[in-house]
Amino acid sequence: MKKLTSIIAIAASIAAADGINAQSTEKHTQNPWTLVYDGAITKNEPGKVNIHPVTYKLNGIDIAANVYTPANYDASGKYPAIVVAHPNGGIKEQTAGLYAQRLAEAGYITMAADASYQGASGGEPRHTDNPAYRTEDIRGMADFITKYAGVDANRLGVLGICGGGGYTIKAVQTDKRFKAVATLSMFNTGEVRRNGFQNSQLSTIQERLKQATDARTQMVTTGKIVYAGVSSVKDEEIAKTSTDLYREGYLYY
């Protein structure tokens, strides 16, 4: 319980920090690891938190991730570790990386990975966000980080952000390697995709299921992939979006 409280307290302090939302998509060109959050590491220095890009296989897919090691990291030591699951539509260089870096500053070995089919990770069709895959991604991060030099596998935690929070809760229900869990702005993807935001689409559930079925049939029979409409949304459409959550999400992701 003490460790759980620690993760939550650290996450809350990060969220309250000034400038946490002052992230720009233009920053990726200015950082050697394409990190876009304020205060991101710009170079690895002795005695400080360092970042280590890594890749590994998960069910035949190449996964791209960043591991953050705490100041004065000693590979022969025993450190608690935390993996961070990014939001729906997010990548490891955004808010997941921010929290991973800040938690490393608190003494943890941390990890943020691009989900399968997303970011720099492999998998087709691109941008697939399947709850079963996302849950498996979290287990895959645990597979990797528990073998990382210096990690105490008996002190493993997980932080899930937004959509990653919902997938995190699902993962820890059955994966008992995780000894602590915390979420931030947790988003129930299944409920919202089914019912709409705040139950705004209850009347169209069957219609949308038919659209999903037709899209799958088309992919199987013709090879053509139907992507969700948000992939081509225009700035003027974003400005007209009445729900703050979606409007700000379009801009950020």
What label would you give each PLM region?
Residues T128-A149:
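Alpha/beta-hydrolase active-site loop
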Residues G89-Q101, A115:
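The serine-hydrolase catalytic nucleophile loop
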